[in-house]
Regions:
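Short, intrinsically disordered, charge-balanced linker/junction segments flanking boundaries
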Residues: 564, 575-585
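Residue-level "contact hotspot" at macromolecular interaction interfaces
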Residues: 126, 470, 565-566, 579
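Sec-dependent N-terminal signal peptides of Gram-positive bacterial secreted proteins and lipoproteins
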Residues: 2-26
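Pyridoxal 5′-phosphate
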Residues: 334
Length: 585
């Protein structure tokens, strides 16, 4: 009986092995040698010619030899190898861009790893298929189509699998040449190469009425029949820098360091988009009445789940320490202006639980207000908890820093939310050239890895600023005041009794805007945007007369409240004995 059972079991095992072998044969690498024929049996060094083909310059026995030869031949030179998964067979180039193609390993998103460290704690992020990557170099190649490249993914300095990208020299972009990309997909998407004309991401300065603006344009890496791909993003992302010239196109690898050339060699200046890098621990200055006005201006009616939610977002801001404008515009983006199926049927404005691989897993809430409060008070809170592995800063940012690193696969997620916030600000100001949220507070970037945040000047350390053990980029803070060579900042973390409060897995916790503040040495912060930093007010008890040259008027007691006016007349102002519970008059 036992022998018979063994024989019976062997049949399905053999069948399974045959199935796997057949599957392997079906998914075996296609050579695509007919697209761009090669003249070398090993490593071929070529230059891209004006028709989009390759002129052979030499054959080499190793990748190292070929790579060295390529570097002597200028920007149009490449190394090609027959074992490459890409139809062009390019495995290295002197200048160009890459496009994500995770389908070669059955993925719908591409995971990339922090460059320059072998630590098991190296940071990672992920992007959608067919998205642009700024190429730096090919760092390894095994002769069988596998290797690694060094590239930049929306600011994130990355190590990326060569198998899962297609390399495109800038010659194809500059000369408007078509190139075959894709192929060797194992998940049924783009099973054969497609012909496309790639485009480089640009930032162009435009004058629109009273606003000098930055127009961001990014393209997908997929099209057919040699056409130009569709936009991955086409956005007015905010005001342009004062030094930027109308009509000029700039290039950037990280959204803030700008260059005059697509190779990003000729640096022209640094400029941080206020809405993109604004810490969420910063109060919005725009009232609830403006929220419906913004929706109406975009032809959104009362049937939207976002209608009449202005007070809800401002209450969430007051209770949980999340900027109401940025929270609202995130909801606009995630919920399709409050009209998506998740918003209408589940009161889910933020896509919680809806993963790229399983969108139907999305959460349901009993009301819109509940969904907003849970997002602000619990879910998003952990993305700006410095102890959480998803923490990369408290701004929306990009793939280098901010909530966008781990929150979404969209490489332009932070820019899309920034664009909506800027649009909201203009509408609130009736397009008169003014902006309310923009530059409303001084914002700074902490310069040093693992810098300390103190409970007072020269006091005790409450927490440090690193994003884990290997990484810190663009840790932005709202600067509230200056005193004795120190900056008072709005704390990213919740604080309790002068110490960081661990919020993981806790219920709702009220964020006190006046007590959740810290101190950092002024020399450790580079101011990047906003108003001049005010001096920390001196505490006065009793009647006094203070001579001042001007007076900033705020919405409430404390520097955490927005400035609503400025008394410019020189003179004496009476300060009365009216000290508030929080210590401010």
């Amino acid at each position: 009986m036992k022998n018979r059972k063994k024989k019976v079991l062997l049949l399905p095992i053999v069948t399974m092995l045959l199935t796997l072998c057949n599957a392997y044969e079906i998914q075996a690498k296609e050579s695509y040698s007919e697209y761009y024929p090669m003249g070398c049996h090993a490593y071929e060094v070529d230059t891209v010619n004006d028709s989009g083909n390759f002129d052979q310059k030499g054959c080499y026995a190793s990748f190292a030899e070929a790579s060295n030869a390529m570097k002597q031949l200028g920007d149009d030179a490449v190394v090609r190898h027959a074992a490459s998964y890409s139809p062009s067979k390019i495995i290295a180039m002197n200048s160009g861009i890459a496009y994500s193609y995770p389908q070669r390993e059955g993925g719908i998103t591409l995971d990339v790893k922090q460059y320059g460290t072998d630590s098991i704690y190296a940071k990672t992020t992920y992007i959608e298929k067919h998205r642009e990557i700024f190429y730096t170099s090919t760092d390894s190649y095994d002769g069988n189509g596998n290797g690694t490249i060094h590239g930049t993914v929306s600011g994130f300095d990355s190590v990326i699998s060569l198998k899962n990208v297609d390399l495109v020299p800038f010659k194809f972009v500059k000369n408007n040449l078509s190139i075959y990309l894709g192929g060797n997909s194992i998940n049924g998407e783009d099973p054969v190469p497609f012909l496309t004309k790639v485009r480089k991401t640009t930032y162009t300065v435009e004058q629109n009425g009273s606003y000098k603006e930055l127009h961001f344009t990014a393209y997908k890496g997929w099209a057919v029949d040699g056409k130009v791909p569709a936009y991955a993003a086409d956005l007015i992302i905010g005001p342009a820098a004062s030094w930027m010239n109308v009509g000029t196109t700039y290039y950037s690898k990280n959204d803030y360091d700008f260059y005059s050339d697509m190779e990003c060699r000729n640096y022209v200046g640094t400029y941080y988009n206020y809405y993109q890098f604004m810490p969420l621990r910063q109060k919005s200055n725009i009232p609830a009445s403006a929220y419906n006005t913004f929706l109406q201006a975009n032809n959104v009616s009362g049937s939207s789940k976002l209608w009449n939610t202005g007070e809800m977002f401002l209450e969430a801001q007051e209770n949980y320490g999340i900027n109401a404008l940025m929270l609202f515009t995130q909801a606009v983006h995630e919920s399709g202006w409050g009209t998506s199926a998740l918003a209408m049927n589940r009161n889910n404005l933020f896509g919680w639980g809806a993963f790229d691989s399983n969108p139907n897993n999305a959460a349901s809430f009993t009301s819109v207000a509940e969904g907003i409060n849970i997002h602000a008070g619990k879910s998003l809170r952990e993305y700006i908890n410095t102890s959480d592995g998803r923490f990369f800063g408290s701004h929306f940012g990009n793939k280098e820093s901010g909530i966008s690193v781990k929150y979404a696969s969209d490489a332009y997620y932070g820019l899309k939310i920034a664009s909506l916030a800027y649009q909201f600000d203009k509408i609130y100001n009736d397009y008169d050239g003014n902006l309310t949220e923009y530059n409303s507070y001084p914002i700074g970037v902490i310069k040093n890895y693992g810098d300390a945040i103190y409970d007072s000047i020269n006091g005790n350390v409450m927490y440090t600023t690193e994003y884990g053990s290997t990484y810190q980029r663009n840790y932005t803070v709202t600067v509230l005041a200056e005193k004795d060579g120190w900056y008072k900042i709005q704390s990213t973390d919740y604080l309790e009794n002068g110490k960081k409060l661990d919020t993981a897995k806790k219920d709702f916790i009220k964020y006190d805007w006046n007590t959740n503040v810290g101190w950092i040495e002024k020399s450790h912060v580079e101011l990047i945007a906003g108003l001049d930093v005010e001096s920390e007010p001196t505490e006065i008890i009793g009647s006094a007369v203070v001579n001042v040259s001007g007076l900033r008027v705020r919405q409430g007691p404390g520097l955490g409240y927005a400035m609503v006016g400025y008394a410019q007349e020189n003179g004496a102002y009476n300060v009365y004995d009216s000290k508030q519970a929080d210590g401010y008059t």
